[in-house]
């Protein structure tokens, strides 16, 4: 059974409220939280997918020094995608080649299983035309092609330029 690598966390954040939002501070905080969706934040060990249950921890926001912005502590529940090495995930195959299998996790995150992490006895079947992709045939006769779901084990995580790439393995399948 695959993990989803989804976790709920409750976090306290110190956020600003622009002068134009001073009459509706909840809207200001929601805008802050919206901008954090699909971002990896230092205080949250993973990528924020959703948030809920915003609570103000102070009765009023504070204006700091000569800033036009006010600041307030809030507590928010966040849904976080945080895969770890060894997690079992499921992805939808979107690319099949002799060098790797590409997948989408949750329809959002890219994953790649390189040839060295595909069982040695699996066979790559070349495409019939240049417009098709190939297919992998497993040792029990199953055909893996774009659109099919595939379980794999997380072998590593790469984060570059704000993007997360999951590296997987099937070697123990």
Swiss-Prot record:
Name of the molecule in the record: DNA-directed RNA polymerase I subunit rpa43
Keyword terms, alphabetized: DNA-directed RNA polymerase, Nucleus, Phosphoprotein, Transcription
Gene Ontology biological process terms from the UniProt entry: transcription elongation by RNA polymerase I; transcription initiation at RNA polymerase I promoter
Organism: Schizosaccharomyces pombe (strain 972 / ATCC 24843) (Fission yeast)
Coiled-coil features, chain-numbered ranges: none
A GO cellular component entry from the record: nucleus
Localization of this protein: Nucleus, Nucleolus
Subunit and partners: Component of the RNA polymerase I (Pol I) complex consisting of 14 subunits. Part of a Pol I subcomplex consisting of the subunits A14 and A43. Interacts with ker1/A14.
Signal peptide: none
